[in-house]
Every structure is written in C-alpha cells, then in structure tokens.
Amino acid sequence: SIVANYAYTHAAITKTATDSEKDFGMQRPNTPRNAFNIWSKYIIETGVLHNFGFGLGMNAVSKRYGQVGRRANTVVYPGYGLLNAALYYRLHKLQVQLNFDNIMNKIYWVGGYDKLRSFPGAPRNIKATVTYRF
C-alpha cells in the first residue's frame, strides 16, 4: 500500500490586537506553507518470508518563521525532509514492528520563537511496537 498527502497552508495574519499593519499577510509562526508525506508498506504473503514486511517513507516541510512580524532578527527555520523505514512481522493476531525514524540522522529544527528558544528535531531513533488484535 502507498499513502501520500500534501498540504498547502496559507495561515496569514489578517488582524492584530494593536492594528499594526506591519504583520498583515505574514505566515503564522511555526507554520510551514507546504507539508508532504509519503509512506509505502508491503507485507509478504507467501514463501519463506511469509508475514514479514517492510515500509519506507518520508515527510517534508517548507521553511517556517519563528516569530511574527517583519523584524530584522526574525528567525527562519529551513525546510527539511526526513527518511523513515519500518520492518514488520505478523503472526495471527500479533504484530511486531520496528520503526527507524530519521534514518539519515538529519539535524533539523521543528520550530521555535527566536535564537534562544529553538526546538531541535529528534535524531535517528528506533521504536519497537508489539500489537495484539482482539
């Protein structure tokens, strides 16, 4: 199976508490204009590797502004793309899964407000999940 999605978000400021026009039309802080995700998953149905599966995907976002306004020191967080993968094994109602996120160990920023309050993204990581369906 393949799942993909794209979102275009024009989250612009249309009104301010002080009616300051300098912020009108600016993209809301920490809101990417573009976001894209794709995930593909395949589970082997026959043969020696019966019930094993794998997945591969990526998620990407465009640049984001750290604060509102046309300020000289406005922080711009660059866009990024992350590559993710997974391995699966199903046995009747039980599934064991390993997810490998940010497999290229990319350094990126998920958002923030200014140079002192910026939030780094997660480094390469592995998650294990066991699921039992009743």
Model-derived features: positions:
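Asparagine-centered polar/low-complexity signal
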Residues: 5, 34-37, 73, 84, ...
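Outer-membrane beta-barrel transmembrane domain signature
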Residues: 61, 72-82
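Residues that define the transmembrane beta-barrel architecture of outer-membrane proteins
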Residues: 32-36, 79-83, 122-126
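C-terminal beta-signal and adjacent terminal beta-strands/loops
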Residues: 59-69, 88-134
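Short amphipathic alpha-helix initiation/capping segments at coil-to-helix junctions
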Residues: 76-80, 87, 119
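Flexible, surface-exposed loop regions and adjacent strand-edge segments
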Residues: 18-26, 70-75, 113-120
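Gram-negative outer-membrane beta-barrel transporters
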Residues: 1-68, 129-133
